[in-house]
């Protein structure tokens, strides 16, 4: 179906707004994936706070101009599915990576975070805010317990030397 100028401008504006508010973006090619599988992906994307859209490459190039995702322009070849993550930078990378494992024809073309092209593996392994805090607290707790044990051992040794 041919798009008129107003429709094209609306698509560019919509994608541009999504890009400006997003933490990260992933580009993929979904040729050969069944409609049923794509519907499942879209549903799980919505639940994860990920905005997904299939957009013509020329419109996508215009939409990302002046955003952090301008670096992805070289990946806009063939059918392009773009996903913006609004809540966690690794959310859509994790989602796409899992989907690509189950669907051989789904190909991840690229990803961007903070204006730079990133490896999808890097983004997929980023911890969520809660996971990062839990890791930090675990490290601090472990360090404090170890330091306390060493302090008691040093105190015990000092008392034994004095006796």
Curated annotation (Swiss-Prot):
GO molecular function: large ribosomal subunit rRNA binding; structural constituent of ribosome
GO cellular component labels: cytosolic large ribosomal subunit
Keywords: Ribonucleoprotein, Ribosomal protein, RNA-binding, rRNA-binding
Pfam short name (any one): Ribosomal_L10
Record GO biological process: translation
InterPro entries per record: Ribosomal_uL10, Ribosomal_uL10-like_sf, Ribosomal_uL10_bac, Ribosomal_uL10_bac_type, Ribosomal_uL10_CS_bac
Electron transport is among the record's keywords: no
SUPFAM superfamilies from the UniProt entry: Ribosomal protein L10-like
Subunit and interaction comment: Part of the ribosomal stalk of the 50S ribosomal subunit. The N-terminus interacts with L11 and the large rRNA to form the base of the stalk. The C-terminus forms an elongated spine to which L12 dimers bind in a sequential fashion forming a multimeric L10(L12)X complex.
Family: Belongs to the universal ribosomal protein uL10 family.
Record function comment: Forms part of the ribosomal stalk, playing a central role in the interaction of the ribosome with GTP-bound translation factors.
Name of the protein: Large ribosomal subunit protein uL10
Native source species: Haemophilus influenzae (strain ATCC 51907 / DSM 11121 / KW20 / Rd)
């Amino acid at each position: 179906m041919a798009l008129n100028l107003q429709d094209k401008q609306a698509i560019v504006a919509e994608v541009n707004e999504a890009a400006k508010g997003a933490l990260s973006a992933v580009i993929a090619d979904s040729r050969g994936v069944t409609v049923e599988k794509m519907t499942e992906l879209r549903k799980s994307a919505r639940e994860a706070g990920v905005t997904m859209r299939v957009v013509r490459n020329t419109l996508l190039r215009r939409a990302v101009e002046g955003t952090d995702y301008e670096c992805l322009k070289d990946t806009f070849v063939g059918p392009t599915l773009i996903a913006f993550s609004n809540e966690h930078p690794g959310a859509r990378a994790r989602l796409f990576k899992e989907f690509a494992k189950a669907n051989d024809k789904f190909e991840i073309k690229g990803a961007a975070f903070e204006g730079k092209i990133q490896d999808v593996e890097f983004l997929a392994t980023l911890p969520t805010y809660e996971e990062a805090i839990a890791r930090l607290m675990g490290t601090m707790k472990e360090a404090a317990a170890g330091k306390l044990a060493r302090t008691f051992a040093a105190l015990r040794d000092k008392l034994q030397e004095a006796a």
